């Protein structure tokens, strides 16, 4: 818990640091955002199969620096409560040291602390109505904390309690991000915004241990090594509602 708070504090300090440096350009905006996220799991190898879309949440701090009238650098701090549901094949040894495979149906959840870095392109205002539309594209750099899973096996029901598997899932998260939205100016210094963003991980979420490798040995020799790695990737469509000052 202390490590998580320290990490969030570091992200906040970085975000506020950008604020202090940007005010001299008189184009900085800072605010808050919140909204749901619709998550599903992908695999570039096909070894993991998506089993449906799960609903998570995201909230955080938003920071924008306008270096031109219609162009801004977007950053801040995102706290994403990710969810997922996928299945894969694992293996176990029987009494004769023969590898038997079985299906694992896995639901998982985790918290990802992320710093986005995006280019925002904004339209001009249309007429007298103070509404502008925008598109944004960039990347997200994140840290995954306390990923938990609940597994159902062939003939074994899923437990009610999620178990922590931090060593199995990588802490590193790197994602491509793109989105569209609209912002409404309340006055010269305050505006509301609504955005729909797509996020796609491009770094494997699974470490090179079980279940990327069957975890069973005969003597000192590992057997049943998985030929095709899971290569798990998180996808999300998120809706954000926020306010900027």
Which residues does each PLM region occupy?
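Flexible, solvent-exposed loop segments that connect beta-strands
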Residues: 41-50, 83-110, 145-172, 206-230
